[in-house]
C-alpha cells in the first residue's frame, strides 16, 4: 500500500515541506531508507530548506526520527496517519 496520504495537502504546510513529505513517501515505497543522505540525493533546493521541512514534519508527528548514528547519519520513518497532529 502506498505511504502517501492526501491529508498532507490540507495541513497548511509550505510547498517545500510537502515536497519533503512526498520524497519521503517515494523512498518508503521503493523500500529505501528515509535518511537525510538519501533525501539530499534527490532534493533540488537548499539543505536548509530540507531541514526545515523535516523539522516541520517531525513537529506534527508525520515523520519520526529513528536513528542518529555517530557518523551524523539521520534516519526516519513515516508515522501512521492516525498519529499525525
Q: For each predicted feature, which ranges?
A:
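Short active-site loop/helix that positions an aromatic residue
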Residues: 23
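Winged helix-turn-helix DNA-binding recognition segment
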Residues: 10-15, 26-77
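Short, amphipathic alpha-helical interaction segments positioned at domain boundaries
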Residues: 80-85
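Short alpha-helical segments that sit at the start of domains
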Residues: 1-20
Amino acid at each position: 500500500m502506498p505511504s502517501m496520504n492526501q491529508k498532507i495537502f490540507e495541513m497548511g504546510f509550505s510547498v517545500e515541506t510537502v515536497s519533503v513529505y512526498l520524497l519521503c513517501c517515494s523512498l518508503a515505497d521503493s523500500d529505501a531508507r528515509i535518511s537525510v543522505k538519501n533525501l539530499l540525493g534527490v532534493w533540488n533546493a537548499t539543505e536548509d530548506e530540507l531541514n526545515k521541512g523535516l523539522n516541520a514534519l517531525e513537529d506534527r508527528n508525520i515523520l519520526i526520527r529513528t536513528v542518529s548514528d555517530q557518523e551524523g547519519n539521520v534516519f526516519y520513518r513515516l508515522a501512521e496517519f492516525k498519529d499525525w497532529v
